[in-house]
Amino acid sequence: MLLDVNGHATYCYTGGKPFNGAQPTVVFIHGVLNDHSVWILQTRYLAHHGWNVLAVDLPGHGRSAGDAPESVEAAASVIAALLDAAGLARAALVGHSWGSLIALQVTSAQPGRVSHLAMVGTAFPMKVSPALLDMSLHQPFKAIDLVNQFSHSMLAPPPSAMGPGTWLYGTSRALMRRVLASNPAVNVFHRGFQACDSYTQGLTAMAHVRCPVLFVLGQDDQMTPPKAAQALVSAATHGRVLTVKAGHQLMLEAPDEVALGLAAFLVK
């Protein structure tokens, strides 16, 4: 599904179902050097259980045109414009990693417009080491391999999740390289990391959130370990935590737990 957002064609995956204005909607927001496909299992489940899903490719990523956001705040304004373009007065937001901060910022800016907020693999502050920031700029393929190593806690997904023989490291590395190549004008890897590293408004934003908040955390996450989310958890007025046995790419490593956890959260 393509939407005109701020004058640019913006791609949203709908989970294999046509958009139905009579149903509630969940917007999924990916992290750095990812695209809509990281949500493939969760979006398909929700789309076939009574929800509209819009899994966006952020501007300058994957199939979406436009300039890649330079900050969490800039990306949040894109998501707000996406809601306008889709004609949505109200929606649930689900974000992973950088996407979780984007979803938080949108919810803070427009609290009456967000029914539920799910922050998956999150942390605040979401600092990136200076060495990794520099590597993402000057040696992006080396940085991809390093990040990929620390983003997974298993070589293959659990049985029945993605089919026998699926290699999580290879799948994620190929995606990251593809997203990097999708925008020859801008290093979206470095730009996304800078956006995470420079974001300072997390606790201020959470203070303005009035809707239910779900934190989905991977117990073996080395990129955003659960302890790094505790400041946000403590600041959430209506928050609860779901911890799953997975690393940072928990949507792929614990797909059923994440999908069912989101589904249970969204009906409340």
Predicted regions and their residues:
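Active-site loop/oxyanion-hole signature of alpha/beta-hydrolase fold enzymes
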Residues: 2-15, 40-48, 52-98, 260, ...
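Catalytic histidine neighborhood in serine/cysteine hydrolases
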Residues: 226-249
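Conserved alpha/beta-hydrolase catalytic His-Asp/Glu region
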Residues: 134-208
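Short beta-strand element of the alpha/beta-hydrolase
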Residues: 22-31
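Flexible "cap/lid" loop of the alpha/beta hydrolase fold
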Residues: 101-147
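Active-site glycine-rich loops that stabilize anionic/oxyanionic intermediates
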Residues: 31-34, 97
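Catalytic histidine-centered segment of alpha/beta-hydrolase-like enzymes
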Residues: 246-260
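Short beta-strand/loop motif that positions the catalytic acidic residue
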Residues: 209, 215-217, 221
